[in-house]
């Protein structure tokens, strides 16, 4: 009987102590930060040799060599863009950004992105996968890093995108600032 009371007492004390200690959540701190730039050159019917992206679907009556009017609603673009560590398109490539974006809002410039960085350099080997909404007119936008392979196996985090350069509908450069919060 005495041992049962002792076990019950220990159990009650442990329960009381566990509920008395506030459950503090660890603040999220990035385990790795990276910065890349990718350069997109939209095919316009005349630049096949240099183009890195193309319109593959458009609203009825709209050309596949020119974005739809107004907010480009309904255009789907696939891309295979060079990734560099600097702003310059002519700098050494460290990989390719491969995926698509869909202009999905009628009254403002917004797209939905899904793409993968395929990295093959002396510094990084593997892939990083991204997905999310991109309100293009915002100065900075956050999208999810949903996973990776190789050096980035099971990584997750946030990528902050900035439009670093914009030359009409022909060319744009995005700065991608990646913060990984889960690293293996």
Curated annotation (Swiss-Prot):
Gene3D superfamilies: Allene oxide cyclase-like
Gene Ontology biological process terms in this record: defense response; phenylpropanoid biosynthetic process
Entry's localization field: Secreted, Extracellular space, Apoplast
Organism annotation: Pisum sativum (Garden pea)
Protein name per UniProt: Disease resistance response protein 206
Gene (UniProt): PI206
Organism classification: Eukaryota, Viridiplantae, Streptophyta, Embryophyta, Tracheophyta
Induction notes from the record: Upon contact with the plant pathogens fungus Fusarium solani, Pseudomonas syringae pv pisi, and the fungal elicitor chitosan.
Any one cellular-component term (Gene Ontology): apoplast
UniProt superkingdom: Eukaryota
């Amino acid at each position: 009987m005495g041992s049962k009371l002792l076990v019950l007492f220990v159990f009650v004390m442990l329960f009381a102590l566990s509920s008395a200690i506030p459950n503090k959540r660890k603040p999220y701190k990035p385990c790795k930060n990276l910065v890349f730039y990718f350069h997109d050159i939209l095919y316009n019917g005349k630049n096949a040799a240099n183009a890195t992206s193309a319109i593959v679907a458009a609203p009825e009556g709209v050309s596949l060599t020119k974005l739809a009017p107004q907010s480009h609603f309904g255009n789907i673009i696939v891309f295979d863009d060079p990734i560099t560590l600097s702003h310059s398109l002519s700098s050494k490539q460290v990989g390719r950004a491969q995926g698509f974006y869909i202009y999905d809002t009628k009254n403002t410039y917004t797209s939905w992105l899904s793409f993968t960085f395929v990295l093959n350099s002396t510094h990084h080997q593997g892939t990083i996968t991204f997905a999310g909404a991109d309100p293009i007119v915002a100065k900075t936008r956050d999208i999810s890093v949903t996973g990776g392979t190789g050096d980035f196996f099971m990584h997750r985090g946030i990528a902050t995108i900035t439009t670093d350069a914009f030359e009409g509908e022909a060319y744009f450069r995005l700065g991608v600032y990646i913060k990984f919060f889960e690293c293996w």
